[in-house]
Curated annotation (Swiss-Prot):
<dbReference type="GO" id="GO:0042274">
    <property type="term" value="P:ribosomal small subunit biogenesis"/>
</dbReference>
<dbReference type="Pfam" id="PF00163">
    <property type="entry name" value="Ribosomal_S4"/>
</dbReference>
<dbReference type="GO" id="GO:0015935">
    <property type="term" value="C:small ribosomal subunit"/>
</dbReference>
<dbReference type="InterPro" id="IPR018079">
    <property type="entry name" value="Ribosomal_uS4_CS"/>
</dbReference>
<dbReference type="InterPro" id="IPR036986">
    <property type="entry name" value="S4_RNA-bd_sf"/>
</dbReference>
<dbReference type="InterPro" id="IPR005709">
    <property type="entry name" value="Ribosomal_uS4_bac-type"/>
</dbReference>
<keyword id="KW-0687">Ribonucleoprotein</keyword>
<dbReference type="InterPro" id="IPR022801">
    <property type="entry name" value="Ribosomal_uS4"/>
</dbReference>
<dbReference type="InterPro" id="IPR001912">
    <property type="entry name" value="Ribosomal_uS4_N"/>
</dbReference>
<dbReference type="InterPro" id="IPR002942">
    <property type="entry name" value="S4_RNA-bd"/>
</dbReference>
<dbReference type="GO" id="GO:0006412">
    <property type="term" value="P:translation"/>
</dbReference>
<feature type="domain" description="S4 RNA-binding">
    <location>
        <begin position="90"/>
        <end position="151"/>
    </location>
</feature>
<comment type="similarity">
    <text>Belongs to the universal ribosomal protein uS4 family.</text>
</comment>
<keyword id="KW-0689">Ribosomal protein</keyword>
<dbReference type="GO" id="GO:0003735">
    <property type="term" value="F:structural constituent of ribosome"/>
</dbReference>
<dbReference type="GO" id="GO:0019843">
    <property type="term" value="F:rRNA binding"/>
</dbReference>
<feature type="region of interest" description="Disordered">
    <location>
        <begin position="16"/>
        <end position="42"/>
    </location>
</feature>
Length: 202
C-alpha cells in the first residue's frame, strides 16, 4: 500500500487531530461524506483499524513499513506498543518535525529527501533513519537549505520541544539526548489497540 497523497483535511475529519499530517483543524467534527453525521455502533475491529490508521497517516508510513515496525517492536524488550511509538517517533523525518524545522512530517520528509539535513555532519536523505541518543541533527550548510528551514520555522507545527531533544535556533542545530518518553508523544493514540489489530496480521 502506497503513501497517502490525497486531501489531508478529509483524513483529519475522519480520524481526529493528526499533528504530524496537518496543522489545520476541521470545521466539521464529523467524518466526510453523505453519511458522515450518521451515528452507528462501531465494531471492535473498526475501532482497532481506526487507531492503526491514525498511526499510519500521522507518521506518513506505508502499511508495509508499519508492519515491519510492529515486528521489530515485538522483538524488543518491554511494552510492544511503547516500542512501536518510539520507533516511529525516532525516525529522522519525525525528529526534524519535532525540532521545529518543518510544520508537518511530510514537509520534514521533503527536507530529508532533498538532502537539506545532516546527521553528525553527514547528509542523510533517508526519512526512516533511526535517530539515536547523542546524534546531532542540523541543517546543511548551504544558503538554500537554511532559507527553507528558516521559512518553515515561522509556522511551527507543535509549540513545545520534547524533553529528549534540544535545538539552537541560531545555528539551526539540534541534538538527540535520549529516546522520547511516552508523555511527549503529541498524537492521541491507544497503541495497545494497534498491537491488537496486528496480532493476527503481522
Amino acid at each position: 500500500m502506497s503513501r497517502y497523497r490525497g486531501p489531508r483535511l478529509r483524513v483529519v475529519r475522519r480520524l481526529g487531530e493528526l499533528p504530524g499530517l496537518s496543522r489545520k483543524n476541521p470545521r466539521r467534527a464529523y467524518p466526510p461524506g453523505q453519511h458522515g453525521q450518521a451515528r452507528k455502533k462501531r465494531s471492535e475491529y473498526a475501532i482497532r483499524l481506526e487507531e492503526k490508521q491514525k498511526l499510519r497517516f500521522n507518521y506518513g508510513v506505508t502499511e508495509g513499513q508499519l508492519i515491519r515496525y510492529v515486528k521489530k517492536a515485538r522483538r524488543a524488550t518491554g511494552s510492544t506498543g511503547q516500542k512501536l511509538l518510539e520507533l516511529l517517533e525516532m525516525r529522522l523525518d519525525n525528529t526534524v518535525f519535532r525540532l521545529g524545522m518543518a510544520g508537518t512530517i511530510p514537509a520534514a520528509r521533503q527536507l530529508v529527501n532533498h538532502g537539506h539535513i545532516t546527521v553528525n555532519g553527514k547528509v542523510v536523505d533517508i526519512p526512516s533513519y533511526q535517530c539515536r541518543p547523542g546524534e546531532v541533527i542540523a541543517v546543511r550548510n548551504q544558503e538554500r537549505s537554511r532559507r527553507l528551514v528558516e521559512a518553515n520555522m515561522q509556522y511551527p507545527g507543535l509549540a513545545n520541544l520534547p524533553s529528549h531533544l534540544e535545538f539552537d535556533k541560531n545555528t539551526l542545530t539540534g541534538k538527540v539526548n535520549a529516546v522520547i518518553e511516552r508523555e511527549w508523544i503529541a498524537l492521541q493514540i491507544n497503541e495497545l489497540l494497534v498491537v491488537e489489530y496486528y496480532s493476527r496480521k503481522a
